[in-house]
Amino acid sequence: SMAHAAMLGKQGIIAKEESDKIIEGLKGILADIEAGKIHFSQDYEDIHMNVEQILTERIGDAGKRLHTARSRNDQVALDMRLYVKKEIVAIKKEIIDFMEALCESAKNNLETVMPGYTHLQRAQPVTFGHYMMAYANMMRRDVIRLENCLEGMDDMPLGSGALASTTYPIDRCLLYTLRAHETVLD
């Protein structure tokens, strides 16, 4: 929302003074959220509506201008990307830790023989180390898949609109620069 407010001001869609007021109001709301001082009302549809209501209560009508040239669909798409990106990083770390444990177990069992199975039947002798490395390699492929997915999370949806963007002269490149995304979604 701060990036959106900054872009609205820079593009002259709203007055710079209003943009600055919105940004300062949002910073205050963020600080209060982090301090546990804000409790969201179920009277409003979602967190975005709650924040806009609190912002308007704090700074007046300028708070209503935050939604100018923006779709809630954009906000939800961005929130999902930010959440998934954060979770992918956490999941990837857990998988890598698991891979390290598998590799350590493999290293400690280079000569521990066990039966290998095919179609639920004993097939040939293998080492437990070899068996552990098979799982480590499966996990490695999962890490690669997560990294590929992570790249897609860097596409910035702000400004896409619910259907066909907006008639306001927004600057999507500025939005993705301010949000630190890699590419702008078409």
Indicate where each model-derived feature is located.
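A helix-coil-helix interface module used to build multimeric assemblies
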Residues: 1-165, 169-175
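Conserved small/polar residues in nucleotide/adenosyl-binding loops
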Residues: 176-184
